[in-house]
Amino acid sequence: MNRNEVLREAQTILNGQRANDYGDSYDNHKRIAALWNTYLDEEYGLKPEDVAVMMILLKVARLVHKHTSDSFVDIAGYAALAEEMSSTENVIEFTLER
């Protein structure tokens, strides 16, 4: 796959069936962060965007064993989500401080 194909596929996945299956990306990552924080005794205070970054790391770990194009597609998707959620979080924090 070339870079455009990877990004198109990531966009299709993020805005298609995956969104229907798991709901809003931010809400889903927020739930995952809450579960991971509980598991880790809330020691780290993970945010939704941390989940996306950690999922990128998981995909990289898998790539060490075997190259798969879907891992690169997933990495592109998680990177886009991390940026979006990070920006959303900043807007929410700014709004709450006013």
Language-model-derived ranges and their functions:
Residues 1-98:
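Intrinsically disordered, low-complexity regulatory regions
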